């Protein structure tokens, strides 16, 4: 009992499935559009945008060449403010913001100026350091080049799901960055409590204006409200999807970050499906996690064979 055949263990350890590789804490990808709350924070706090600033999306950002595209191209979103930009995940809004943050005192574009501002706010959200979880975790990487692409979560941004979870937790609670923990309590052999554990505060984002949090929360709430994926829930949610490009030979990675209930969050969620094609798949997993958390009796619904219908409720990224 409690033993494993060495040949079988070797097969598991060397197999292509990599079952001993903890993807949640060790696998890193670009965050895609889940990064846009950081870009919005930077833009609002640095004065590049406010609640009334709009950017017109024609489907392509033509200020630079080659011109990066919005996911809706060849269509366009039209004029959007920051709340609508999060709701619709408009890339052009954030291309423009990443460009504007890189304009120097002479009116010239300097990508480093833009990435420095994005890095500042990403670090405030804890993305310049590990999450504190008690198992091995890969070191995060905040993008240091291409401010236009970095503003939509591309560039050289590279994070684990655990790090994205800590970030969205800080979004949900308006600026408290916690160290993650997997340990609830320790007991002795007789079940007597040795120590209770709780997440410890890493840092607080006290300098961020309450109006900034309000706008970001509104955008994430409207993203969920406008998606049929989340229809019929008996609790409110806020969230943001993401699609991270790998290369032309592989499907995109897809992500979802969110929290619930939207008004008084109890739960934060981060989902990534490597090479997952459609962010709707990640969104539905995030939704189902929340459903089971608040209604444990619904767990049986997740094994009804309906996985083939996933991903139909969300367009774009």
For each feature predicted by the language model, list its residue ranges.
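Beta-lactam-recognizing serine transpeptidase/beta-lactamase-like catalytic domain environment
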Residues: 1-33, 38-274, 314-317
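Short, gly/Ser/Thr-rich active-site loops of penicillin-recognizing serine hydrolases
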Residues: 193-195, 200, 285-317
